[in-house]
Curated annotation (Swiss-Prot):
Pathway: Porphyrin-containing compound metabolism; protoporphyrin-IX biosynthesis; 5-aminolevulinate from L-glutamyl-tRNA(Glu): step 1/2. The lineage of its organism: Bacteria, Pseudomonadati, Campylobacterota, Epsilonproteobacteria, Campylobacterales. One of its GO terms (biological process) is protoporphyrinogen IX biosynthetic process from glutamate. Homodimer. Substrate binds at T50, C51, N52, R53, S110, E115, T116, Q117, Q121. It catalyses: (S)-4-amino-5-oxopentanoate + tRNA(Glu) + NADP(+) = L-glutamyl-tRNA(Glu) + NADPH + H(+). NADP(+) binds at G190, A191, G192, E193, M194, S195. Pfam families: GlutR_dimer, GlutR_N, Shikimate_DH. One of its GO terms (molecular function) is glutamyl-tRNA reductase activity. The gene is hemA. The active site is at C51 (nucleophile). Belongs to the glutamyl-tRNA reductase family. Catalyzes the NADPH-dependent reduction of glutamyl-tRNA(Glu) to glutamate 1-semialdehyde (GSA). This is Glutamyl-tRNA reductase. It comes from the Bacteria.
Amino acid sequence: MHYVSISFTHKNTDIGVREKLSFSDNNRRREILRLIGANDSIAESMALSTCNRVEIFAYVLDTQSSIRHILNSISILTLVPFEALELRADIYEDQGAIHHLFAVASSLDSLVVGETQIAGQLKEAFKFAYDNEDCGVNISSAMHFAFKCAAEVRALTTISKNPVSVSSVAVAKAKEIYGNIGGMSAVVIGAGEMSRLAAQHLINAEVNVIIINRDEIKAQTLAKELGELASYASFDKLSEYINRYRLIFSATGAPNAIITNEIIEQKDFHRYFFDIAVPRDIDIEEDEYIHVYAVDDLEEIVRTNLALREEQASIAYSIVGKSTTSFFKWRLSEGSTPAIKALRLKAKDIACKEIEKAVKKGYLKCSDQDEASKLVHQVFKAFLHTPSVRLKEKNSDDILKALEYLFDIKIQKDENLEGNLK
């Protein structure tokens, strides 16, 4: 069995295609996992979808046929041609897939290295797949190690100190444009995590924030959480507010643009629209007074961020590498379990037969049979303890073959485990 990861990110796929690939809607995510799971070669799968990436992580029997099936499933659901997906996708297998997963969880593969949102998004994607029975023990164990790795990266590096997200980069861009934005007012559309982060960064810069959301109760709740610099307005005020204020940040989960040319009025002051949603919320024409920044337009600030964090990222990648090795060593030790079980079953079988013979021949009283069984089993348990420990330390093919030959047992094993440590 093999781990595979198919990745579409800001590195290999433009925002227009990423919009089509988005699985952030639960119904859509459920459907892609259903299509993927229809292939008998794919035992487990999960789908991660954020503004900067779409990832499918799977545990499969045959890598090549599974990868083709996954790409074909995405093509069927999104109508993006198979060839276009195949051309763009970064594909990782086995050790590469686990290393990539750990790097993603540790925010080393993010548009903004060190941003803290990705861990929560990954946990949510895993929980969704687990609750819907699309993944089991093999992806669960990988995710457990991934979150452990991410925690170690946060603890041993400064890469996530002063947390940075796409939302904070958008606010940083506004500061770059205006200098001091304290005292200004900004409209934030949406009440989800990205909107909340944008609003919080604006308030930290002493900007008055107006929250607009289709669900007015959510807008009201968020405004209350943010404090006295935050207020809210009903969604039917959207057109009025985006034509009144200079700073507009939008991060809704809408499937189509909510700000279009039809609701834009001509004004004689500069307005800056920050579209931090995927799919995009804003589809308007720019002119001398209207400026639009989408997720991909923020890469210049992100590159600066990368340069500042390069040394810490190097340390973090070292942790990811060690965690990847530790994961496969753990998998290998778990792979020794069938051998240990086979030895103990063999010992138990022999003990039971010999005790029965002893009873039949009169060497052992029938009333003492249970106590004798317990004693013999304890002896075998003690005898097999050291071999069991040694097997977990080095579960090599030669040792397993020798055990099969010497004790006449059959050991079921995963041929792929040891190869990942070479």
